[in-house]
Amino acid sequence: MLSNEQMLCIIVTFVMISINEQITAEMWSANMYLAMSFYMEKEGFCGMAHWLKKQWAEENEHACSLADYVIKRGGKAKVDKLDVVPNDFGTPLEVFEQVYKHECRVSEMIDKLV
């Protein structure tokens, strides 16, 4: 049988792993938004490109906030290998449908984390 101290150590380790997975997800999201921004700029949708760059900055901020949380508690914040993001996104409507689906997925991840 595990002691309370051992159980606490297991829980803390699990939480730190989960937060680091979220950091990686936030960084992937940032890369996706940046790729979308570049794509929309190329397609001539400068306003949409600007908004997507704002989302890129927001995702970076989320990742940094999570990393700060881990570090301040003596943990090791890390970004695991990031999957390649797509570079072609279709019409502006398709871009924002992808944004919506992605935000729903990330929100689910956050809900599971907390």
For the regions a language model picked out, list residue spans one by one.
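Generic cytosolic/nucleocytoplasmic N-terminal low-complexity/intrinsically disordered segments
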Residues: 3-4, 75, 111
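Disorder-to-helix initiation segments
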Residues: 3-22
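Mixed-charge, polar/low-complexity N-terminal
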Residues: 4-5, 9, 27, 38, ...
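Juxtamembrane/interface segments of multi-pass membrane proteins
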Residues: 11, 43, 85-88
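Residue-level recognition of alpha-helical structural elements
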Residues: 15, 45-48, 92
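Acidic/histidine-rich alpha-helical segments that form the ligand environment
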Residues: 18-25, 29, 33-36, 68, ...
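Conserved alpha-helical segments that form or flank metal/cofactor-binding pockets of metalloenzymes
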Residues: 36-81
